[in-house]
Amino acid sequence: MKVSLTLLATLCASLASAGVVITPVHQDQVVPAAQKVAGDCFFGVVTPQGCAPLRT
């Protein structure tokens, strides 16, 4: 049990440090359409930090 909990905590820390954690953003954090480049983001919307799902 302790080993699996340790592995899970290590995985979560690794994903968070790699910037893989997906945080929904608000409309005021989205890059305007005129500044986007085709293929910038295959899901969600483009933000200054990268791609993210839009919070509605």
Curated annotation (Swiss-Prot):
Q: Which residues form the signal peptide?
A: 1-18
Q: What happens when the gene is disrupted?
A: Impairs pathogenicity. Forms pressurised appressoria but is hampered in forming penetration pores and fails to differentiate a penetration peg.
Expression induction per the record is: Expressed at all stages of pathogenesis.
> What Gene Ontology cellular component terms go with this record?
extracellular region
Signal as a keyword of this entry, yes or no, is yes
Where it sits in the cell: the answer is:
Secreted
Swiss-Prot/TrEMBL keywords = Disulfide bond, Secreted, Signal, Virulence
**Which branch of life, at top level?**
Eukaryota
Q: How does it assemble?
A: Homodimer; disulfide-linked. Dimerization can possibly extend to multimerisation.
Q: Which family does it belong to?
A: Belongs to the MC69 virulence factor family.
Q: What does this protein do?
A: Secreted protein required for appressorial penetration of intact host epidermal cells and for pathogenicit, but not for subsequent biotrophic and necrotrophic colonization of leaves.
**Official protein name in the record:** Secreted virulence factor CLU5a
Name the gene that codes for it.
CLU5a
